[in-house]
Amino acid sequence: MNTTIAQQIAKEGGVEAYLHAQQHKSLLRFLTCGSVDDGKSTLIGRLLHDTRQIYEDQLSSLHNDSKRHGTQGEKLDLALLVDGLQAEREQGITIDVAYRYFSTEKRKFIIADTPGHEQYTRNMATGASTCDLAILLMDARKGVLDQTRRHSFISTLLGIKHLVVAVNKMDLVDFSEETFERIRQDYLTFAGQLPGNLDIRFVPLSALEGDNVAVQSQNMPWYTGPTLLEVLENIEIQRVVDEQPLRFPVQYVNRPNLDFRGYAGTVAGGVVKVGQRVKALPSGVESSVARIVTFDGDLEEAGAGEAVTLVLKDEIDISRGDLLVDASQTLAAVQSAAVDVVWMAEQPLVPGQSYDIKIAGKKTRARVDNIHYQVDINNLTQRVVENLPLNGIGLVDLTFDEPLNLDKYQENPVTGGLIFIDRLSNVTVGAGMVREPQQNVYQEPSAFSAFELELNQLIRRHFPHWGARDLLGGK
């Protein structure tokens, strides 16, 4: 057993008390990202090592692996704790998103170690989609690079508001305060182009030597701020969904017997309470919450992130993919939306194509009407393109086969985030973040002349690959 865990169990007074304390600690999900060889995996290995989260057999295995694959001479190569794939160890790079868990007395953490290479942008976007904070690692010798800008942009695009800029390898620049300040100013100048209200913090460190990671550095007396671990332990995460209106996407209708009908799902925003009047969308039918059921017993209320089963006072028609909101709130159904897309397939995204999409438990179909632009994620410029290639990020217009109740992604990632699914292979080919739900911009049929209506039907019959919309309101 890990000696630190054994000590904590003894301190808490037994296994049950320890597990109870662990369960009620706050959880922080964060990712590490940066350019190739900036030391992301080494930093995570250092965090695990210095917080004593490594078991004895892991430490023994690490000694052996360091001799075979290590890059640090006689020292332990802490990066090997995270780089688990054989290809990663042989190449000395991170390819897949590697997840690790550790905890301190103050908090629990889930780390996503994401790839630094541009060709693995989709992997990084996947890792960032569930995180609250991003650690942007920089090599003190190189400063702000294109990949640093790219990772900053992707992180903020996916809703991350807290950025910790970790200036690594300070030991290679003689722990120079001047170098650190120059990099700090360069990044703040660039960060002015990023969207939203960002919380940006800076920590100079050496992941290899352990300076300012979990222990205050004796080599940088000029830095009086917190260590990286202290930042992670004490930072207050602003979760927008806690302050948002109620959003409860129904994932499953639970009917084990004739006497029970519940709607299972995870609260995606706001708070639901017993007795609260709710409205089911898209039907608009109202009822009130009779019970909030969980495995551990009934609750009086449930907040964002809690998985519960709601029992309503009335038996109304609700199915998987429907959305429960507060009865006093309105959420308009829209047929189209402007969506930021991260494309993940070898086959590029082309206007006119249709895909299955999944959003908050609901599955439907969408057509790509237009690609406004692709973002050059190395310098944040926009360029007009005919298609969106693998790892491309751009703004597109989508038209849905049926009206959907959507939020902006920055307001609610669950009801504003979607995935694209290839209709033939059933493979996920892209991720989308709703920037702006759009009301139906099409004219009523009566606004078109008889000639326009006839021409529209002719085009749809003989040129279906053009993807022309039915002006009479069909699909």
Curated annotation (Swiss-Prot):
Its EC number is 2.7.7.4. GTP binds at residues 34-41, 113-117, 168-171. Pfam families: GTP-eEF1A_C, GTP_EFTU. Gene3D superfamilies: P-loop containing nucleotide triphosphate hydrolases, Translation factors. Residues 25-241 form the tr-type G domain. Residues 168-171 are annotated as: G4. Pathway: Sulfur metabolism; hydrogen sulfide biosynthesis; sulfite from sulfate: step 1/3. It is an enzyme of class 2 (transferase). It catalyses: sulfate + ATP + H(+) = adenosine 5'-phosphosulfate + diphosphate. Residues 34-41 are annotated as: G1. Residues 206-208 are annotated as: G5. Heterodimer composed of CysD, the smaller subunit, and CysN. This is Sulfate adenylyltransferase subunit 1. The gene is cysN.
